[in-house]
Amino acid sequence: MVGPGPTASAAAEERWQKLQEYLAAKGKLKDPNAKPYLKAKNICPKPPPSKYTPGPKKDVSNHVLPSKTTRPINIKFQTKPASITASQKPESKPPKLPSRGLTSRCFSSNTDCKQSSKPQQQPRAVSFTAGLSRNPRQCPDIQELKTKQQQQAHGGNAKCTHPETNTHAAKQPVDGFPDETNKENLPQALPKPEKPDPELHSIRKPNTGSSNQTQKGLAPKQILSKSSVTQTALKDRANKQFIRNTQIRTQAVKSRPRPTVADSTRPREKPPQTAPSHSVPAHNKTQTSKKPMTKNTQDITVNRVRYGKPNETKIESCPATEQKVKHTKPSSQLNVLQGGHNSRHPNMRQDQKPVQPHLGPQTSCVLQKSRAISQRPNLTARNFNSVIPSTPNMRANKTLNNKYNNIFQQKAQTLDSKFRKFPPQSHFLNKTAPRTQASTAAASRKGAPSATQTHPHGKKPEGEDRRKQLEEWQKSKGKTYKRPPMKFKTKRKVIEEMNTSFWKSIEREEEEKKAQLELSKKIDSTLTECLRLIEEGVLPNEIFTIVSSIPEAEKFAKFWVCKAKLLASKGTFDAIGLYEEAIQNGATPVQELQEVLNVLQDPCRSTEAVTSDTSAAGTNTTSAEELAKEESEQPCPSLTEMEPIAAAAPRIPVSEWDNHGIKLQVAPIPRICGMPEVQDMKLITPVRRSARIERTVARYPEMLQEHDVVVASLNELLEVDKTECFIFRENEALPVTLGFEVLES
């Protein structure tokens, strides 16, 4: 096998080097790739297949490769230059937006080429040209410059043919692709058979690393930041040599005759000789079943009728099969990620009838359309992905390609996906309407208010504020409550009533006291008049009737005095029983009654003394003095026995004993260390006791009764207690000395 001439190769390399220097001077040079063998995969995305009329599937794998017995297909790989790596093999599907220069360079040279190319070399050339023309980042000016230089290079290289191209009898020329380029602007859209030739499987092994290049192609901004002139020149030089070989093979296809049905069945009989057995992947059947579709079915029909070539399906199927075998693995990685596009192409697995190429007038059309294509704005990786088709068989390979898909998905994420992956703390606001970074930036430039601006005060109003707002709203609407609000005046009324009743009760008590005082004065005056009448000698029955008719007269001591005198005038009477009855009725003052009873019981006393006593009973002072004199004159055996006590006890003034509530409380002296003689003495303290309590104290429990001894007078004290010495203790609450000397300390 003889390769292309050294002169053409050197000229192509020189032109390519000049182009790279020009791009470097303009600052538009592509960044170098650390893995140049992935460049072809990075440049060549897969276009979506065209819509077509579904037809019966045909197995054309038996008659697509003619004259396979003479020379094997793998011979051309033995003479491949060493600088061309395995990953530079063309892709299975051309890109959505190919470059104008490279596309025109490929097709413009077809007019001078001979149809003697090897059938397996034609799809390689076309697909690689599509792969090189995939780069969307080149500006239109650079692409036009490339187009001119590449057209010149094809002019010199078109005459050189590879000896290997004579092995097959007939192949379809490369000019069959312009019809497809008119619709999708793609240099390649050929159908492929349902079952590819097993001899062609050995070519796709080196494409395993090409997925990394496609991943890097999806992030063009990251690639552009790492530019190097030296590595790019070496990479492009290798690609240039490969393009030159593919162009020569493509031109040589025209001169070959069409194979017959008998010849097309030969390629299955002989396996490839030079391809290693380990280079064929295990999943080749699933991936090779994917077929690129033609875009325009009308062009297919017109070209078939125009040129009248019935065996077009057999001629076209072989290049499509070889091309698809080479690029099945990288294309499956792209199509697995974009399985959503399968709905657009439901008939993708059915065979298409290719268009018979026409070498003459279509070349200029391709050049013009390729220039128009190159002037379109550059697309991002997302736009390429949106047009890449996928089939169910491609999705079936997802489990076999997990390693490549994981790497591709990680690097294929754009800035928007990273933003969505790591949302801010307020991501719950954007769940219903997620925004990308671009839309957020655009909204901020337009002045759209953010969530924090629209709600600067996130605090809710308090209950009082809400109640006021509700009241204002109800007033504005004219609404009222169905029932009046609760009033608290009832409680205030109760308090006022309690206060008024308290003061009223006090007033009532005062009035009652005044009325009682007036009544007591009237009763007292009436009883005094009765006593006067008794002394005058009025009939006792009439006086008794008058005294009994007075209400509440039993509470006065004068009533009992009148009664006692009336009984005494009649004869003897029970003075003690009368006294007890007076005490039970609460007669006051009791001392006045005692004095009268004592006078009435004295047999030695004359009637005059009695009358004088009764006449002087009006004044308490005179009667008390007389009683004291009488008591002192009367002999008392107890006084003689207790002379020291009587001598020590002073005479109590009568004025201090007028208050009958004052009594003497006898209590033992607390124990004092070092003074044993004091323990025999007792303390006498004047206290005030109520007559009402004394009357009811017998009904009280033991705890409420008087614990100490309480006597009404000194005589009772001598009778109750036999202590020889008493000590008087002054009561601060009751400043009464009772005639005792108070030692000032």
Curated annotation (Swiss-Prot):
Entry keyword annotation includes Phosphoprotein: yes
Pfam families per the UniProt record, alphabetical: CKAP2_C
Keywords noted in UniProt: Cytoplasm, Cytoskeleton, Isopeptide bond, Phosphoprotein, Ubl conjugation
Cross-link (Glycyl lysine isopeptide (Lys-Gly) (interchain with G-Cter in SUMO2)): K195
Compositionally biased region (Polar residues): 67-89, 101-136, 205-216, 224-233, 242-253, 284-301, 427-442, 608-624
Disordered: annotated segments: 26-305, 319-362, 422-483, 608-638
PTM annotation: Ubiquitinated by the anaphase promoting complex/cyclosome (APC/C).
Family: Belongs to the CKAP2 family.
Comment, domains: The KEN box is required for the association with the APC/C-Cdh1 complex, ubiquitination and degradation.
The protein's role, per its UniProt record: Microtubule-associated protein required for mitotic spindle formation and cell-cycle progression in neural progenitor cells.
The protein's name in its UniProt record: Cytoskeleton-associated protein 2-like
Species assigned in the record: Mus musculus (Mouse)
